[in-house]
């Protein structure tokens, strides 16, 4: 993987953050339901 300009790196970071948010959302759902 060759390092590219920030313009191409930013969308990847946004996708990673989005996936983490979805992952945390799935993990928190059961706890929220029990609360």
Swiss-Prot record:
Cystine bridges: none
Q: Which GO terms describe its biological process?
A: anaerobic respiration
- Can you say what this protein is called? High-molecular-weight cytochrome c
Q: How is it modified after translation?
A: May bind 16 heme groups per subunit. 14-15 of the hemes are low-spin bis-histidinyl coordinated, and 1-2, high-spin hemes.
Q: Which domain of life is it from?
A: Bacteria
Q: Which gene encodes it?
A: hmc
Question: What lineage does UniProt assign to this protein's organism?
Answer: Bacteria, Pseudomonadati, Thermodesulfobacteriota, Desulfovibrionia, Desulfovibrionales
The molecular function GO annotations come to:
metal ion binding
**Organism this protein belongs to:** Megalodesulfovibrio gigas (strain ATCC 19364 / DSM 1382 / NCIMB 9332 / VKM B-1759)
Keyword list (alphabetical) reads: Electron transport, Heme, Iron, Metal-binding, Sulfate respiration, Transport
Task: Tell me which stretches of the chain form a coiled coil.
Answer: none
């Amino acid at each position: 993987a060759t390092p590219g300009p920030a313009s191409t790196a930013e969308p990847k970071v946004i996708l990673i953050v989005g996936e983490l948010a979805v992952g945390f959302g799935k993990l928190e759902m059961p706890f929220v339901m029990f609360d």
